[in-house]
UniProtKB/Swiss-Prot annotation:
Lineage, opening ranks: Bacteria, Bacillati, Bacillota, Bacilli, Lactobacillales
Major location (coarse): cytoplasm
Family label: Belongs to the TACO1 family.
Entry's Gene Ontology molecular function annotations: DNA binding
One GO-annotated biological process of the protein: regulation of DNA-templated transcription
Organism: Lactobacillus johnsonii (strain CNCM I-12250 / La1 / NCC 533)
Localization: Cytoplasm
One GO cellular component term noted in the UniProt record for this chain: cytosol
Official protein name in the record: Probable transcriptional regulatory protein LJ_0904
Keywords for this protein: Cytoplasm, DNA-binding, Transcription, Transcription regulation
Amino acid sequence: MSGHSKWHNIQGRKNAQDAKRGKVFQKLSREIYMAAKSGGPDPSGNPTLRMVMDKARAANMPKTNIERAIKKAEGNSDEHYDEITYEGYAPGGVAVLVEALTDNKNRTASDVRVAFTRNGGSLGATGSVAYMFDRKGYLVIDRSTTDADEDQVLLDVMDAGGDDLETSDDAFEIYTDPKQFTAVRDALEKAGYKLANAELTMIPQNTTPVPADKKEQFAHLIDALEDNDDVSNVYTAAADDDE
């Protein structure tokens, strides 16, 4: 791995999203609905639904909200959302991937384009930056929840079929082939680990430092994208400040 650790960034983003909790729950409800609609309402037989439900619980989404979204998918609702990925560059030439669930592709494309252009970025064509990222399974064990040391965790991760382990003061971060994600997650939970995070994500092959004079503009762009109701995930190739 490139050493591009995600957990610190995820924690920071989660804290920032606490003030936008209603919007976060709305987006998660949409993801749960689509996962249940396409793969069935039983998470034991629908790994995508289980993953999104885990994500919702990690965001402290109420159980009633989760159940409501699943029941809606089981009903006669003809509501449909298209999965769209947008690609572009942030200020400083940093690659950005934007994943959206939308019921109006024209509206979302326009909103995403405006977010880029108003904040010093540029929206690119399909394929312009996607090749710079790899799809990976990503799991996190909070070190405060386990007595296992790094050697033991590494052994368990390898036995489970994981690809890589990164260690920090507060977490073990595990990366897997996306096809092995469910098997690795289940094996680690069976081994007694409590997962603080478990999701499929996009990891940059290389990172780009954000120039000091572009950092504020870069932050505004990411905020504008994440504030969009249709945007599910934003991935960047920005280097951490300590890289």
